[in-house]
């Protein structure tokens, strides 16, 4: 049930309140997503159980000497985005359902987990793959910044 993060990611997560075997109750997230007609897939559920509620300060995308913040909960993106728009603009590209799991980059980018466990970012018409799985995603999000544009 737990992820296996590398040392870099583990250090950043621990500094921001995460700990091994973390498991939180996500009933509130589940309720919010259901109300907004989002599908809570298994990958997103695992993500929320282990990382939900964390606000992570990490290296900025545009300047390694600056910091950025990623917030892992679905409340803001579920309130901001219409699931029909997400389907038309993002899901149709990857042919999978997406669950919003947080925001980052000054709250400009919304993070999603797909049914297959991929981690994606969307900002208006821009849509990208951040990682094929959560472990590679967080390393890429926090340090490498090699996002793959999909549109």
Please tell me what each predicted stretch does.
Residues 1-108, 149:
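A surface-exposed partner-binding patch
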Residues 113-116:
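Short acidic-glycine loop/turn motifs at beta-strand connectors
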Residues 119-126:
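Short, compact, well-ordered microdomains
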Residues 127-151:
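Compact, glycine/acidic-enriched structural inserts
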């Amino acid at each position: 049930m737990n992820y296996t993060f590398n040392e870099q990611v583990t250090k950043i997560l621990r500094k921001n309140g995460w700990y091994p075997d973390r498991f939180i109750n996500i009933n509130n997230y589940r309720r919010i997503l259901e109300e907004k007609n989002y599908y809570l897939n298994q990958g997103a559920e695992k993500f929320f159980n282990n990382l939900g509620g964390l606000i992570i300060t990490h290296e900025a995308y545009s300047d390694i000497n600056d910091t950025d913040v990623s917030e892992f909960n679905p409340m803001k993106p579920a309130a901001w985005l219409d699931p029909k728009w997400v389907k038309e603009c993002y899901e149709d590209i990857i042919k999978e359902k997406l669950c919003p799991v947080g925001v980052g980059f000054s709250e400009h980018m919304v993070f999603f987990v797909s049914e297959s466990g991929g981690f994606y970012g969307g900002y208006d018409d821009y849509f990208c793959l951040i990682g094929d799985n959560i472990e590679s995603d967080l390393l890429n999000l926090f340090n490498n910044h090699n996002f793959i544009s999909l549109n």
